[in-house]
């Protein structure tokens, strides 16, 4: 018998005319975006481009001022961040939300407990075999099985980022949002993180908010470039590398008839 299982029709995430206003300032203006199931998408831009504001609108941490947002074909504009998590969104934040005084394992227990929904408290009695197995599985998936009993404050910044990715996976999300996960990492740590993101289950859609062009272009299949709150360019990594406007606005270059003049 032929397998007739297919992915849901249409994009997993669709934004139309998304705007976010703070007083008289448009932090995000009229953004349209379609992200396909299983796609790795980077939203790239310098500081102040509106990337994190757009992240917060998608995640539900901040309401949009205008426009519509659909996830899996459902309008989620009025759904809270926890509600979006239950629908299948996972996320990591630029500012760490880890408990540095707890072990890697205990942080994972908290993520697993949270994935079960409702108001629950982490106690030793609450930790069952299923939770323990799931925490160790998540640690193993990001290469932290040897650090499972180590206090989070004692592991490297790069390992903390890996732990955040593991915790975001606890809910088995269909879409993962990562806000500048490479921020503050050394070159080696950035490479390790990008390798990890490339090895994620290909059924998980990934949206990477990033100001580091090397990270964005290494991880993403498609890139959306933002500037001054607007989407200005969209394309594959090769198309982004070759785009004169990207060089002029992002790399500090100046477009001339002779090519791109980059200033130091």
What are these regions (language model features)?
Residues 2-264:
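Glycine-rich phosphate-binding loops of nucleotide-dependent enzymes
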């Amino acid at each position: 018998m032929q397998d007739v299982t297919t992915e849901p029709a249409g994009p997993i995430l669709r934004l139309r005319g998304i705007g976010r206003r703070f007083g008289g300032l448009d932090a995000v203006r009229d953004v349209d975006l379609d992200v396909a199931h299983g796609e790795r998408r980077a939203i790239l831009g310098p500081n102040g481009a509106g990337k994190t504001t757009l992240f917060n609108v998608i995640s539900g941490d901040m309401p949009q001022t205008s426009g519509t947002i659909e996830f899996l074909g459902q309008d989620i504009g009025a759904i809270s961040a926890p509600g979006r998590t239950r629908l299948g969104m996972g996320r990591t934040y630029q500012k760490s939300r880890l408990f540095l005084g707890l072990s890697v394992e205990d942080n994972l227990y908290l993520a697993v407990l949270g994935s079960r929904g409702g108001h629950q408290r982490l106690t030793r009695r609450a930790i069952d075999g299923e939770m323990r197995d799931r925490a160790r599985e998540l640690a193993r998936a990001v290469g932290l099985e040897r650090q499972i009993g180590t206090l989070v404050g004692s592991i490297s910044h790069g390992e903390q980022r890996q732990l955040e990715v593991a915790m975001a996976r606890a809910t088995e999300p269909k879409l993962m949002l990562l806000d500048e996960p490479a921020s503050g990492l050394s070159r080696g740590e950035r490479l390790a993180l990008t390798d990890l993101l490339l090895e994620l289950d290909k059924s998980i859609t990934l949206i990477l908010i990033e100001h580091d062009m090397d990270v964005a272009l290494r991880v993403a299949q498609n890139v959306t470039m933002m500037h001054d709150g607007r989407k200005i360019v969209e394309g594959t990594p090769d198309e982004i590398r070759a785009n004169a406007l990207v060089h002029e606005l992002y790399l500090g270059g100046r477009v001339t008839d002779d090519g791109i003049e980059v200033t130091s």
